[in-house]
């Protein structure tokens, strides 16, 4: 085998192909370029490849004129990833035509296609005069624009100066590229069970099944959630079976409004009013449709540049924005929200080297909106609760938040029902160095189940501040104060009281009860304080504190919650010390817990280049103490096994004792497996009195036009990987996800309205499989089942030596298989590499435009060729 053909074979086994033409042209061009380098210098405008450098006989070399102008490929249609200014735009079939002597082949892109990628067509002279289906001469019509096809990456790189681009936020993906997905049905199942042997209380068995089903048709998504439970115990006669329907809803996105429509069962957002479940209809903003640079709160930067200048913005010492602006006033409104605070340092660097530096204070609370951004929700329906004592009154709710200049936000909302009316209004402010604050008040008129009417107000404060110098982040301080007459909507939904009869010494009389007789609504909420603080200690330690304190009207009882913890690391050894306290207003005493956890990876004692399986394992120790004398100590190991690390295990053993409970040994062991067809787990735990076996299986089923595909549990948005004929191919960066026997797999999650990269590990392909493309990009809408399709060539890998009139075929001739879509370029000695070939067929060869510059070769291979890594064959082309 010649060196050139060996390189061709190695290149192809790495699956670096394009759809219609092989990348062998790259090596032809490289070889010819090396030969050309030995010649005397020629004018770059008139490159000429002397075929005598390839063969003494000029007839032994095909027409290589296309390489003289830099063409790596002949004109044709190729599937490519389109990148504009280094940002991904789309993956589509693009037709490439012959350009001038300097351009080689050029892409044919229409005005509408360029406009969808952000080109401001009105800013380019003469572009709007072109026909809708005309190919835009991009590099000649747009000054300094470039178009380059990277054959090896199957990528079309476009660059267009910012002056000709529409003003779009960073990370913007045109809605035209959002993929609503395919029509398909889905089912998620999650089954778990346990068997308990209790030496004192007897044996018990429990099982639970959660079924989440759905149907996607176009942009509509239908979802349903149903559960089943089973319980049997020695303490009770018989067993209990229970099916329960949780919810059903239909939803879709409303792209022009950047909103989402929900019909059926849903829930309201809890940003202004308390979140509630409903059955009805809701139209609400979906900020996921916005680019990352437009989500969350960030200040709008205004400045003035003397000339064309570079603007750099830093936050907490990190560059978060960099752009070039024209002379004059400028506005930057697409800064990515980075945390909740941290002042922004803006630097304007002029072309002459002079700089302007100023600081824009920045803090945020959850309700703050960017300047000019509006978020809303409108809900109408009936109240929905799993509490049988609550009714289903109809209600209407609306909320609105709007960002104003100078860091201000106004917001408000209404809740209206027959027995309840509430109105909210609030303001928020980014106060810069002083933090961020929002204040709102809700006025409510309530009619309770005893028909008593109440008016009240509730005032809420939210505050956020970071002290960057000390590493302190006051993530949230919240306080809500409610008057004695304030009730929320849920309080008014309990079944009404019509009175009851009581016996007295004067006989039976009818009495109208007070609401305190049946429902515990007398102790309505009064004040609530919330606090969350994190403190950075050095580079590897973090201290956190969080807590809440709730008081009630009519009682001195309070709810209290408090958590504190210290996370630290020394080299690769991690340990955590934590404390928690919980007190319920209606229960005596309080629950406290102190815990210590230490984890040491075994790689701490292994060489960095060790191949031992123990490099994926860690030793652990944990201690917990309830501060009432009860303590548990556990030590053990945990880690992962198998090539894909999709089998995880944990074994712990120790001692529990003290307090009022029994003392003795305790421990547990668990195994969890994540596979291409689903997940499974099993575990066992024991103490002196109790032994427990628990187990579970979960997964997803996807029914689509190409059949049924099993996978791991499906999230809201998923990707169907389609590689027909390529079984057991691994999806990169996904534990346990591989194609099934037909070449299909389910990527169980994807990020909606964002570019998702789906790649196959070509090292896991069978020897008889080649891929045209190993990477696909998808941009799914919310709830979509999008298809990432890969074209696999399944068949024999063939190295053919072709002759014509007893001579090797000309160097550079194009070879195409009639029975498959495989093609290649003839190297020296008439050799060509083809993949995905059947046992018998014919190939067509072309090396020029003349009548006698093409031929056809028939071939027949023995059956054992299907088991060979590479088959060599000689054939006569006629």
PLM regions: where:
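Extracellular beta-sheet/turn segments enriched in Thr/Pro/Gly and aliphatic residues
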Residues: 155-159, 366-369, 774-795, 859-878
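Feature captures outer-membrane beta-barrel proteins of Gram-negative bacteria and organelles
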Residues: 178-180, 205-218, 242-255, 392-406, ...
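A short, solvent-exposed loop/turn motif at the edges and junctions
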Residues: 118-120, 164, 761-775, 847-860
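Transmembrane beta-strand segments that form the barrel wall of outer-membrane beta-barrel proteins
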Residues: 162, 181-199, 220-232, 261-265, ...
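Structural motif
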Residues: 67-70, 83-84, 173-177, 300-308, ...
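Exposed, low-structure sequence patches enriched in small/polar residues
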Residues: 511-517, 522-818, 823, 827-839
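A short, solvent-exposed beta-strand micro-motif common in secreted/extracellular proteins
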Residues: 111-116, 345-348, 669, 753-765, ...
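Post-signal-peptide, soluble extracytosolic/periplasmic N-terminal scaffold domains
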Residues: 2-11, 18-19, 27-297, 626-702
């Amino acid at each position: 085998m010649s060196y050139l053909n060996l390189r061709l074979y190695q290149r192809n086994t790495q699956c670096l192909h394009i759809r219609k033409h092989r990348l062998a042209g790259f090596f032809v061009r490289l070889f010819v370029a090396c030969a050309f380098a030995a010649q005397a210098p020629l004018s770059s405008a008139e490159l000429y490849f002397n075929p005598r450098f390839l063969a003494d006989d000029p007839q032994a070399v095909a027409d290589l004129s296309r390489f003289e102008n830099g063409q790596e490929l002949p004109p044709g249609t190729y599937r490519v990833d389109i990148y504009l200014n280094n940002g991904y735009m789309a993956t589509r079939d693009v037709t490439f035509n012959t350009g001038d002597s300097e351009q080689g082949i050029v892409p044919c892109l229409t005005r509408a296609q360029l406009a969808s990628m952000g080109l401001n067509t009105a800013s380019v002279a003469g572009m709007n005069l072109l026909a809708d289906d005309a190919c835009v001469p991009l590099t000649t019509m747009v000054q300094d624009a470039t178009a380059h096809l990277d054959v090896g990456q199957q990528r079309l790189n476009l660059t267009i100066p910012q002056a000709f681009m529409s003003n779009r936020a960073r990370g913007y993906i045109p809605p035209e590229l959002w993929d609503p997905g395919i029509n398909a049905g889905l089912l998620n199942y999650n089954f778990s069970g346990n068997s308990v042997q209790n030496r004192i209380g007897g044996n018990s068995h429990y099982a639970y099944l959660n079924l989440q089903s759905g149907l996607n048709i176009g942009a509509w998504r239908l979802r349903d959630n149903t559960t089943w439970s089973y319980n049997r115990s020695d303490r009770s006669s018989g067993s209990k079976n229970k099916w329960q329907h949780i919810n059903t809803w239909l939803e879709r996105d409303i792209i022009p409004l950047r909103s989402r429509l929900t019909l059926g069962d849903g829930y309201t957002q809890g940003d202004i009013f308390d979140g509630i479940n409903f059955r009805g209809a809701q139209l609400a903003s979906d900020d996921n449709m916005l680019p990352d640079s437009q989500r969350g709160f960030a200040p709008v930067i205004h400045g003035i540049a003397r000339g064309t200048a570079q603007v750099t913005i830093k936050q907490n010492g990190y560059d978060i924005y960099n752009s070039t602006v024209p002379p004059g006033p400028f506005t930057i409104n697409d800064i990515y929200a980075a945390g909740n605070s941290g002042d922004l340092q803006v630097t304007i660097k002029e072309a002459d080297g002079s700089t302007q530096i100023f600081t824009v204070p920045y803090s945020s609370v959850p309700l703050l909106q960017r300047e000019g951004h509006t978020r809303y929700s409108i809900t109408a329906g009936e109240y929905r609760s799993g509490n049988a004592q609550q009714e289903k009154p109809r209600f209407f709710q609306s909320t609105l938040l709007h960002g104003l200049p100078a860091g201000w936000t106004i917001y408000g909302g209404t809740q209206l029902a027959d027995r309840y009316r509430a109105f909210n209004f609030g303001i928020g402010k980014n106060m810069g160095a002083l933090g961020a604050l929002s204040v709102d008040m809700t006025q409510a008129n309530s009619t309770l189940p005893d028909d008593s009417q109440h008016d009240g107000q509730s005032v809420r404060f939210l505050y956020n501040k970071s002290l960057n110098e000390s590493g302190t982040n006051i993530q949230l301080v919240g306080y809500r104060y409610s008057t004695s007459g304030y009730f929320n909507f849920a309080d008014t939904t309990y079944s009404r009281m019509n009175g009851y009869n009581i016996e007295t010494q004067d006989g039976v009389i009818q009495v109208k009860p007070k609401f305190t007789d049946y429902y515990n609504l007398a102790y309505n909420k009064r004040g609530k304080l919330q606090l969350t603080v994190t403190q950075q200690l050095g580079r590897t330690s973090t201290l956190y504190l969080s807590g809440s304190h709730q008081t009630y009207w009519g009682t001195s009882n309070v709810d209290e919650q408090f958590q504190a913890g210290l996370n630290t690391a020394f080299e690769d050894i991690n340990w955590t010390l934590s404390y928690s306290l919980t007190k319920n207003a209606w229960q005596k005493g309080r629950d406290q817990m102190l815990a210590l956890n230490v984890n040491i990876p075994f790689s701490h004692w292994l060489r960095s280049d060790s191949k031992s399986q123990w490099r994926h394992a860690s030793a652990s120790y944990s201690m917990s103490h309830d501060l009432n004398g009860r303590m548990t100590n556990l030590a053990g190991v945990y880690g992962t096994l198998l090539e894909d690390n999709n089998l995880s295990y944990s074994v712990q053993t120790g001692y529990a004792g003290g307090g009022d409970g029994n003392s003795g040994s305790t421990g547990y062991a668990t195994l969890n497996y994540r596979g291409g067809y689903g997940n499974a787990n099993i575990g066992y735990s024991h103490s002196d009195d109790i032994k427990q076996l628990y187990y579970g299986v979960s997964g997803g089923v996807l029914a689509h036009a190409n059949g049924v595909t099993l996978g791991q549990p499906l999230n809201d948005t998923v990707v169907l990987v389609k590689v027909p004929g390529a079984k057991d191919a691994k999806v990169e960066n996904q534990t346990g996800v591989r194609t099934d026997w037909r070449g299909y797999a389910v990527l169980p999650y994807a990020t909606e309205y964002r570019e998702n990269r789906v790649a196959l590990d070509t090292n896991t392909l069978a020897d008889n499989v080649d891929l045209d493309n190993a990477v696909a990009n998808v941009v799914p809408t919310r709830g979509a089942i999008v298809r990432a399709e890969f074209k696999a060539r399944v068949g024999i890998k063939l190295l053919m030596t072709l002759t014509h009139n007893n001579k090797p075929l000309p160097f550079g001739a194009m070879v195409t298989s009639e029975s498959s879509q495989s093609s290649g370029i003839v190297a020296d000695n008439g050799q060509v590499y083809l993949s995905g070939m059947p046992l018998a067929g014919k190939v067509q060869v072309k090396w020029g435009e003349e009548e006698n510059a093409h031929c056809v070769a028939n071939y027949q291979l023995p059956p054992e060729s299907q088991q060979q890594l590479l088959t060599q064959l000689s054939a006569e082309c006629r």
